[in-house]
């Protein structure tokens, strides 16, 4: 999922960038 669309597909790997 894209960090700009967290509701698209929640993965801790996406939020790891934040």
From Swiss-Prot:
This is L-amino-acid oxidase. The keyword Plastid does not apply. Transmembrane segments: none annotated. Belongs to the flavin monoamine oxidase family. FIG1 subfamily. GO terms for molecular function: L-phenylalaine oxidase activity; toxin activity. It is found in: Secreted. It comes from Bothrops alternatus (Urutu). It catalyses: an L-alpha-amino acid + O2 + H2O = a 2-oxocarboxylate + H2O2 + NH4(+); L-leucine + O2 + H2O = 4-methyl-2-oxopentanoate + H2O2 + NH4(+); L-phenylalanine + O2 + H2O = 3-phenylpyruvate + H2O2 + NH4(+); L-methionine + O2 + H2O = 4-methylsulfanyl-2-oxobutanoate + H2O2 + NH4(+). Its cofactor is FAD. Contains 2 disulfide bonds. Disulfide bonds: none annotated. Homodimer; non-covalently linked. Its EC number is 1.4.3.2. GO terms for biological process: apoptotic process; defense response to bacterium; killing of cells of another organism. Catalyzes an oxidative deamination of predominantly hydrophobic and aromatic L-amino acids, thus producing hydrogen peroxide that may contribute to the diverse toxic effects of this enzyme. Is highly active on L-Phe > L-Tyr > L-Met > L-Leu, and is weakly or not active on other amino acids. Exhibits diverse biological activities, such as slight hemorrhage, induction of platelet aggregation, edema in the mouse paw and bactericidal activity against both Gram-positive (S.aureus) and Gram-negative (E.coli) bacteria. It is an enzyme of class 1 (oxidoreductase). Keywords: Antibiotic, Antimicrobial, Apoptosis, Cytolysis, Disulfide bond, FAD, Flavoprotein, Glycoprotein, Hemolysis, Hemorrhagic toxin, Hemostasis impairing toxin, Oxidoreductase, Platelet aggregation activating toxin, Secreted, Toxin. One of its GO terms (cellular component) is extracellular region.
């Amino acid at each position: 999922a894209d960090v700009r669309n967290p509701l698209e597909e929640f993965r801790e790997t996406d939020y790891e960038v934040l």
